[in-house]
Amino acid sequence: MPTSAPPLNRFERRRAETRKALIRAAREFLAESGDTSASIQSIAERADVGFGSFYNHFESKTELFDAAVADALDEFGQAIDEHLQGVVDDPAELVAAGFRLTARMADSHPELVKILRHRGLRHIHSERGVAPRALRDVERGIASGRFADADPLTALSAMGGVLMSLVELRFSRPDLDGEQAAANMAEMTLRMLGVPSDEAREVARRPLPTIRGE
């Protein structure tokens, strides 16, 4: 019979809290500009930890920022999953809803979406975050005949490019109707995947689950 892991002692809790604080600080820097040139001292000060604590957790800034991106992408992917898995089953609707939820999350989860804006393109084929979830939905859609027969990774690349364009549009043109832009781009993506035009338009505008925190 499996047993639960023993509770962390005080030292282990403090160590875990320090690591989380460093990752949180790195995420803030990434969200602000995408720049990774901040000094270790600046990161430690933002995290409110001692300079020497940094090297107890990370060998370099690169390792820290990689961990921060992975942490943000995992949280982003989980947020999408929480609102769609078990609620939406149609692969086409999952793809469309993912686009539209991302646009909404620019308001409800701005830090996550800003990190996606600055760092998402290089992680389109990552094994972390939203990429494996999107690939899962594409593969299901192709296997079921919902989407046209195509190479799933190529389809994922095309979808990722459109999603990143939507994110950039959301921040660079706040005057535009983000909901409408997301629905339009979701519709075009579904058509690209082989969904008939009229159906793509309808699917891309179905009611969405509510995002926590809205």
Residue ranges, per PLM feature:
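Short, hydrophobic secondary-structure boundary micro-motifs
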Residues: 39, 113-117, 150, 198-203
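Amphipathic alpha-helical packing segments from all-alpha helical-bundle domains
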Residues: 74-81, 96-97, 101, 119-168, ...
